[in-house]
Amino acid sequence: VLSPADKTNVKASWEKLGGHGAAYGAEALERMFLSFPTTKTYFPHFDLSHGSAQLQGHGKKVADALANAAAHVDDLPGALSALSDLHAHKLRVDPVNFKLLSHCLLVTLAAHLPADFTPAVHASLDKFLASVSTVLTSKYR
């Protein structure tokens, strides 16, 4: 459960991304594909090379979804319902992949926002991403 301090940290962190959300989302995806090659199986039709338009486009989708979740942190199930349906019923993404992407997002944010990535912010973002992952996998059951 996200505390009031966690929610404040999450919202502040997402505001600090500014116009870089899409680039950071793409970088996190690229990190995931390089570190965990089995995750590429869900993207057989994508050009996964560095800087590809498809990678950038999906990075933007990830960043936009997380920005929406951060803006609606008090109602994650409502904010992510359509994405949960998509990933569970149509795409059938293995739930472990959400944890892998969450880890890569944390690494990316830490690399780009080192002064802001305090232990408290790290913990808050980790809890937030775990909550997002839980919601996204809730319809698998």
Curated annotation (Swiss-Prot):
Q: Does the keyword RNA-binding apply?
A: no
Q: Which residues carry this modification: Phosphotyrosine?
A: 24
**Sequence positions bearing Phosphoserine:** 3, 35, 49, 102, 124, 131, 138
Signal sequence segment: none
- Keywords assigned by UniProt, alphabetized: Acetylation, Heme, Iron, Metal-binding, Oxygen transport, Phosphoprotein, Transport
Enumerate the transmembrane spans.
none
Locate the N6-succinyllysine modifications and list their residues: 7, 11, 16, 40
The Globin domain covers 1-141
The modified positions for N6-acetyllysine read 16
- The chain residues annotated with the modification Phosphothreonine are 8, 108, 134, 137
Question: What's this protein's name?
Answer: Hemoglobin subunit alpha
